[in-house]
Amino acid sequence: MAIVKCKPTSAGRRHVVKVVNAELHKGKPYAPLLDTKSKTGGRNNLGRITTRHIGGGHKQHYRLIDFKRNKFDIPAVVERLEYDPNRSANIALVLYKDGERRYILAPKGLSVGDMIQAGASAPIKVGNALPMRNIPVGTTVHNVELKPGKGGQIARSAGAYVQIIAREGNYVTLRLRSGEMRKVLAECIATIGEVGNSEHMLRVLGKAGANRWRGIRPTVRGTAMNPVDHPHGGGEGRNFGKHPVTPWGVQTKGKKTRHNKRTDKYIVRRRGK
């Protein structure tokens, strides 16, 4: 893994910083684990915009990732590491002893030729997936389930991880990167180690077009709009003279957005405290 700063041969290259990984596979992805991915332009079935700033971008195939890690007690070998345009993390193609291939998130330190395994009897080793009741307290894990059998939902992006800090009864307590501490059923499966490609945060796109390649359209400030388009719009000068709100008038910048009170009992400590 190397950080490469491009030479300023043009305005669009001047500030570009790339993350180069020589271990990544340079050929095509494994076709049986690909699925079609249609562009929506951020529109729903009525043609109305439901998500702003989406449109265009390069065509992509979706890689079918094994987030459940439910092929228990069958060892697998890492065939290759690959780039995935759908996520910040890299992925690994693994070949199981019974001949099946699957994609998994590539954890930090996993290399081609390494052996991995899932199941309660798997050793504590990077890339192995176990129920958290079998993982020692203090271990760093990723791709953590919130419900047994549903598949990993926590810590899936590049460089992400959570730490198991306690085990009590049927629950384990996790410390998330945000500082939040929450309880999860000990039967839930997690993968040992942290997600790889942590240098992803250091990349600099360098020009607007690089975001357009990714299907991301420009974000216009509310103060630059007319009053008909945004509550911050219009007026003389740049001061909109009110509390900041979304285009639909909902308070922003600090307003609480969590509404799922049913699971509040599992959160031991809120993030940022």
From Swiss-Prot:
Basic residues biased stretches: 253-262
Region of interest called Disordered, as start-end residue ranges on this chain: 221-262
Gene Ontology molecular function terms on file: rRNA binding; structural constituent of ribosome; transferase activity
Keywords: Ribonucleoprotein, Ribosomal protein, RNA-binding, rRNA-binding
Matches recorded under InterPro entries: NA-bd_OB-fold, Rib_uL2_dom2, Ribosomal_uL2, Ribosomal_uL2_bac/org-type, Ribosomal_uL2_C, Ribosomal_uL2_CS, Ribosomal_uL2_dom3, Ribosomal_uL2_RNA-bd_dom
Top-level lineage group: Bacteria
Keyword Nucleus attributed: no
Pfam families documented for this protein: Ribosomal_L2, Ribosomal_L2_C
Entry's Gene Ontology cellular component terms: large ribosomal subunit
Function field: One of the primary rRNA binding proteins. Required for association of the 30S and 50S subunits to form the 70S ribosome, for tRNA binding and peptide bond formation. It has been suggested to have peptidyltransferase activity; this is somewhat controversial. Makes several contacts with the 16S rRNA in the 70S ribosome.
Subunit structure of this chain's protein: Part of the 50S ribosomal subunit. Forms a bridge to the 30S subunit in the 70S ribosome.
Protein name (record): Large ribosomal subunit protein uL2
Native source species: Haemophilus ducreyi (strain 35000HP / ATCC 700724)
